[in-house]
UniProtKB/Swiss-Prot annotation:
The gene is kdpA. The chain crosses the membrane at residues 4-24, 65-85, 133-153, 177-197, 253-273, 285-305, 380-400, 417-437, 484-504, 528-548. Pfam families: KdpA (PF03814). PANTHER family: POTASSIUM-TRANSPORTING ATPASE A CHAIN, POTASSIUM-TRANSPORTING ATPASE POTASSIUM-BINDING SUBUNIT. It is a multi-pass membrane protein. This is Potassium-transporting ATPase potassium-binding subunit. GO terms for molecular function: P-type potassium transmembrane transporter activity; potassium ion binding. NCBIfam families: kdpA.
Amino acid sequence: MKYIVMQDAFFVVLLLVLAVPLGIYMYKVMIGEKVFLSRVLEPVERFGYRLMGVSEVGMSAKRYAVSVLAFSAVGFVFVMAVLMLQGFLPLNPEGMKGLSFSLAFNTAASFVSNTNWQAYSGEAALSYFSQSIGLTVQNFVSAATGIAVLFAVIRGFIWKKQKTIGNFWQDLFRVTLYILLPLSLILALLLVSQGVVQSFADYSVVETLENGAKQLIPLGPAASQIAIKQLGTNGGGFFGANSAFPFENPSSFTNLIEMLAILLIPVALVVMFGRAVKDSKQGRAIMTAMMIVFVIGVVAITISEQFAGPHYQGVATSGSMEGKEVRFGVGGSSLFAASTTAASNGAVNAMHDSLTPLGGLVPMFFMQLGEVVFGGVGSGLYGMIGFIILTVFIAGLLVGRTPEYLGKKIEPYDMKMVCLLILVPPLLTLFGTAVAVMMPSVQASVSASGAHGFSEVLYAFTSMGNNNGSAFAGFAADTTFTNMVGAVMMLLARFIPLVAALYLAQNMAGKSSVAASSGTLSTKNGMFIGLLIGVVVLVGALSFLPALALGPIADFFTTFK
C-alpha cells in the first residue's frame, strides 16, 4: 500500500509540474502571441487559412455555434461513409467489411462528439484506413473543437462590451497545429520506443508454444491513434481491450505516460484560465476543488480494490486482481480508472465490470458529476465554469446580493444557459437508462443479473450521456436500440451544453465589468472551494442517488451474503 501511495503522489506532482508550463504556452496560443514553434508553424498556419478561405473576423455566438455544428456534421457524414464503405477502400489487408448502418451511425456520433464509445472491437471490425483516416482525424478535430469553445467562453469573461467571441476556424486550426499535433508527435514517438505498434503490415500468423497452434497477431498504426486518444480525452482504443492490451500499453512506464496524457491538457487548461483572467488564484481555486474530488476518488477506488475483494484462506494476494493486468496491479489500475472517468476519456487498462462494487461506483459517479473533475479537453472546464456560476448564484441568494463572477454580473439569461450546461447530461442519462431497462434487447445484452446487471446498463448510459465512452464490458452494446439511442444521446450531450456555453460567453462579453466591493463573494478562497465542491457533489447526488442505490450500492450490500 505504501508503494501505491508513493506512486499516486509522484503522479500528481509530475502532472502539475508538466501542466504549468503547458498552460502558459496554451494561453499564448489562445491570444495569438508568438511561441517557440511560431517560426516553423506560422507559414503553415497562413497557408492553411488561405487554403480554407478563412478570415480572422470575430464571430457572434450564433455564427460560432453554426460553424461548430456544420463542421461536426461534415465530419459525421465522412466518418459514417468511411465505416460503411471500408470494404471498397484501401489499407484493408484483412478484408474488413463495411459496418452496419446502426453501428456506423453510433461510431460516427461517438467520435464526432469526443465520446469514443465503441460497440465493436477495432482489430476485428475496422481497416487501417478507417482507424487512421476516419477515427484518428476525428480524435484531433473533436478535441480541438472543445478547446476552441473554451477559448470563446474565456473571452466572454475577459472581454468587455464586445459582440463577438473569437473566430472558430482560427481557434480550431491553432489548437490543432500548435497544441495537439506537437504533443501527439512526442507521445507517439515515446510509445513506439516502448513497443507500441505502428505498422501498416498485414496481421502476423505465429506458431504458439502450446501444441504448435497458429495464432493471428493484430497489428496496425496504433501509436499515432493512442497518442491523440489520450491527449484529446477521446479514449477509443485501436484494439478491443484498449489500454489493457500489450500492443497499446506494454509496461508500467507507458501506463504512467498514458495516464499523464489523459489529464495533462485538462489540468493545463485550468492554469491557462488563471493566466487569461489575470488572476492565477482563480485558477488555483478551481484546480484545488478538482484535485480534492479526484484524490478522494482515487483513494476510494484503491482501498476498495485492495481490501474489499474476495479473500481466500492461505492465499496471499495483492488485492482484487480480477480483470486487471499483473503489470499494472491494483495501484496502476485504480489510478487509471479514476483518471479516465474524471477526464471524460474512457480508455481503460482494466475491466471496470470486474471492479468491486464500490470500486465501480467511483468511476460511475465521476461521470455523473458532469465530467467536470478535470473533464474533457475544453468541455470539462466550461462545464465547471457553469457550476461556479451556479455556486455564486446560490451564495448570492443567501446574502441577498446580485451574484457576480470575475467582475461580470450573473443575470437570469446566464442562469438559463447554465441550467442547460448542467442538467442536460443527467436528464439524458436517466431517461436513456429508464427506457433501456424496459427494452428486451437491452435486457438480453446484460451478462449479470440483479443489482450488477442494472449497474451495467446504468454505467453504459451514464458513459454515453456524459461523453465518456468507457463501459462495463459485460454489457453487449452492438444492438440496434443501443446504437441508435446511444448515438442521439452522445450528440445531444455534446452539442446542447456546447451551444449553451457559447451563448453564455457572448452574453458575458457584452457586459462591462463591475468593481469588486466589500460585499463581493471571493471566488478564490477556501470557503468558496468548499462551496463549489458541495454544489458539484450535491447536484450529482440528488440526480443519481436513487439509481446508484439500485445499482452499485445494492451490489455492495449483496457481498455480505
